[in-house]
Amino acid sequence: MDSVLRQSKAVCPFMKKATASSLRAMTTAARPAASPCGGAISKLQVLAHRCPVMGKAMAVQSARTGGRASAAPASFVHKAKLHTGRPREAQAVEGVFTGQKAGLPPHPPVKPTTATAANPSPAACTVSGNFGTKFNYEKFYENELEKKHKDKSYRYFNNINRLAKDFPRAHMATKEEKVAVWCANDYLGMGRNKHVLEAMHTTLDEYGAGAGGTRNISGHNKHAVELENSLAKLHATDAALVFSSCYVANDATLATLGSKLPDCVILSDSLNHASMIQGIRHSGAKKIIFKHNDVEDLEKKLAALPLHIPKIIAFESVYSMCGSIGPIEKFCDLAEKYGAITFNDEVHAVGMYGPHGAGVAEHLDWEAHQRGETKGTIADRIDIYSGTLGKAYGCVGGYIAGSAKLVDTIRSLAPGFIFTTTLPPAVMAGARAAIEYQMSYDGDRRLQQLHTRAVKEALADRDIPVIPNPSHIIPILVGNAELAKKASDKLLNDHQIYVQSINYPTVPVGQERLRITPTPGHTKQFRDHLVAALDSIWTELGIKRTSDWAAEGGFIGVGEAEAEPVAPLWTDEQLGIADAVAELRAQASDEKKGVINQLLESVALEQEREALNAAEEVADAAKAAAASA
């Protein structure tokens, strides 16, 4: 620097008069506030631009480099750092699903010319002028979609319009095309429950369509407060917080906690939902994957971590694609032993399990919760619940529930909550009505469980392979993406039955399936129609039956000779059918027909829908009596 200054002072009259220290000061000083120049320049550069000699030289230099400079990324001053913008990302998962590592779909190799066009070097992207061609965005989209078509994982949407007055039927593009829907997540038919609809109609008429803003600005209202109070009551927690969906609830909560807790490590079940995986990734926290429902594997990973660092064990209670149920009590034991907190996603369980519909954690201590004794139960040991206002509750939205300080932390820090318009008042009123209804009446979930058992029995009689599980999910194994799609299409086109095929990436390649979800409305005529159609299609397409899988040694629980029978989570005693089942079995009745199918045909349960409607009338009367009191 000193040698440059000496040379400059010998040439420039201005610099001859200036001292070396003043010149150095001008090179580090910021430009004047009124300077019109772009970028950060020194006072010396400003003066040089005014010089008749240096000004011309700098103009030439600026013209030569201007193209590259204008294409360079802009530098933003005072850029806010959100927790989702951390430079460190969660470690990538090798296989989200069991067996995924060896089961990726075979994508066609990309030709070198295609790779060059689709993945240009950074220089090619930033240099303007005649330095290559512009990026072909439409071609990129086309290539990505072509991959999906070739590996048979491209998704087609069916036009399904569910009919509130003809549940569980729907019409397709035209009202004349009626189909029976067997794969909806409105598990209990609450989307057409009269109490829910009345609450929504009344609220809509009085308060209008939208909430009018975020919770912080104009969108906080009595409907949100009442709904969150009902959710906190459901889970016996201090507080709850409502989100626009459970995807957002999971993403926002895990991202916020993982980024804010110092040196946090999140231990995640290998089959966790995409929303949880995304939230962990957004958190930037270290992520450790443990084998699905494997308590021993989880403990090994916990034991290897320092006791003092924050840890979150993230899992689901019911896994929607296979129907398995998490070992919640054992996870709580490990959390307490190793200083972790638990994050329990009850999305597919709320409304479906437990005396009050609070989920699997409540169901595991049935008698205690029936008595209202929640202290010390498994449910009481959970730190964070997440759940949905859709599915069993028939509306839309998601939530978390937990301690008051936890909920307030997420409320105050999570962008996914802060910057989203509040759910419409009518939706929140309907969701609250559904929650309160299911807390006081268990007839829907009991009938749903009976219908689930009946379908599983009937499919077993036809040698149709159901992946064993203790829940309300009925995953029928196909094992081939193309066959799964064909089976779904034939059900729809030939039998007017809608069951969506489930392919990669939702499930691993080779484990493609049809997923059936019975409801209280799927009575005998619907069941018989479904089972006969599946039997016919399995024969027509040559899809493997349970005996075929058994001949090959079994696969993911289907046809495995030494596999233990899987008992339903709902016991006969909890369903109130223990005596009737014992009597039927003692009579040595028709085993091929299945005990539950016989039970549903018996005099006691012959009028299923009438009994359900009568129970609703009783609930109405109780509600009216409570209001008058």
UniProtKB/Swiss-Prot annotation:
Keyword Thylakoid found: no
UniProt xrefs under InterPro entries: 4pyrrol_synth_NH2levulA_synth (IPR010961), Aminotrans_II_pyridoxalP_BS (IPR001917), Aminotransferase_I/II_large (IPR004839), AON_synthase_class-II (IPR050087), PyrdxlP-dep_Trfase (IPR015424), PyrdxlP-dep_Trfase_major (IPR015421), PyrdxlP-dep_Trfase_small (IPR015422)
Residues annotated as transit peptide in the record: 1-69
Key words, A-Z: Acyltransferase, Heme biosynthesis, Mitochondrion, Pyridoxal phosphate, Transferase, Transit peptide
Source organism, top-level taxon: Eukaryota
Catalytic reactions on record: succinyl-CoA + glycine + H(+) = 5-aminolevulinate + CO2 + CoA
Major site of localization recorded for this protein: mitochondrion
Residues forming the catalytic site: K391
Compartment(s) of residence: Mitochondrion matrix
Chain positions found as N6-(pyridoxal phosphate)lysine: K391
MF GO annotations: 5-aminolevulinate synthase activity; pyridoxal phosphate binding
One Gene Ontology term, aspect cellular component: mitochondrion
GO biological process: heme biosynthetic process; positive regulation of organelle assembly; protoporphyrinogen IX biosynthetic process
Enzyme Commission number: 2.3.1.37
Metabolic or biological pathway, per its Swiss-Prot or TrEMBL entry: Porphyrin-containing compound metabolism; protoporphyrin-IX biosynthesis; 5-aminolevulinate from glycine: step 1/1
Binding positions (substrate): R155, S268, K287, T506
Cofactor requirement: pyridoxal 5'-phosphate
Family: Belongs to the class-II pyridoxal-phosphate-dependent aminotransferase family.
Subunit relationships: Homodimer.
Function: Catalyzes the synthesis of 5-aminolevulinate (ALA) from succinyl-CoA and glycine, the first and rate-limiting step in heme biosynthesis.
Record's protein name: 5-aminolevulinate synthase, mitochondrial
The organism of origin for this protein: Neurospora crassa (strain ATCC 24698 / 74-OR23-1A / CBS 708.71 / DSM 1257 / FGSC 987)
Gene from which this protein is expressed: alv-1
